[in-house]
């Protein structure tokens, strides 16, 4: 399959995808209820989409093309409420979080679709271990070249997105010490990491054609990059976030990314360069391991500061952009989150500490999702 033409899209429109956990109400382990839930939702009216994912213990909800924060919040809230109402008759719980805290990967099954079966055959047990849950945000770009500028410019802020959304400290019943352990599962795939540093669509197309000629990839879906262009939508897709515990936080983070994109496209505070990636992996690890308390190394100034402080410094620059986009409330929430140094990973650990039970903690995350 050749690289698709870059579709025209309205700049700075955005879309949000959330992968959600489906658990039974008996012991709060993952349960393969996606087909039952989708049948129960048949005929309901809502914007956006609700669809199956790689595991039948997972379901994805996604907005349509959103122009502002309020629209995304409304669309996701409606889908959340429909799903929660439908789940009651199925004895099913729905929750956010980047990993299920005690599920055993070998118990998982792979959804019966050609794409997912191909992934399972190609990657073996990695496909079952990929039962992790993320938030993806698409940002509309005015041109294909601008999409590559934005992809590499916004790459500096990947630690922000990871730390703000981090909600996956537990894996198979163990506290990993990470704020976001989910991304360790993604890193196992050979085409993960960062996109190649090219700034024109012609150069990107040449790279794609070479990779396809090797037989390593067939389409853009085979790249598991942290941020990737999506030519069929005319967007870039930011893919590093854990699924937050509430719709509210997911929308706050999406609006933050939208405001940051506007700032980068209109103000051009710097030009992306290859050296930006010298500290990329270190900064990414710090965000995964320590969340908002991790260290951020500035790629040009070579200074160090807490990730939370770097977020707060950028929020000042984003204020006029958030105002223009109608998302000052979201920016205020992001400021408060960064100032508190306390993300969803902190909440999950506290819930487990108080309940002395991972199962009860999952029950509480279901309540969080249903209420927020």
Curated annotation (Swiss-Prot):
SUPFAM superfamilies: Glutamine synthetase/guanido kinase
GO MF assignments: ATP binding; glutamate-cysteine ligase activity
Catalytic activity: L-cysteine + L-glutamate + ATP = gamma-L-glutamyl-L-cysteine + ADP + phosphate + H(+)
One biological process term in Gene Ontology: modified amino acid biosynthetic process
Domain of life: Bacteria
DNA repair in keyword set: no
Keywords for the protein's UniProt record, in alphabetical order: ATP-binding, Ligase, Nucleotide-binding
Protein family according to the UniProt entry: Belongs to the glutamate--cysteine ligase type 2 family. YbdK subfamily.
Function: ATP-dependent carboxylate-amine ligase which exhibits weak glutamate--cysteine ligase activity.
Name of the molecule in the record: Putative glutamate--cysteine ligase 2
Annotated organism of origin: Cupriavidus metallidurans (strain ATCC 43123 / DSM 2839 / NBRC 102507 / CH34) (Ralstonia metallidurans)
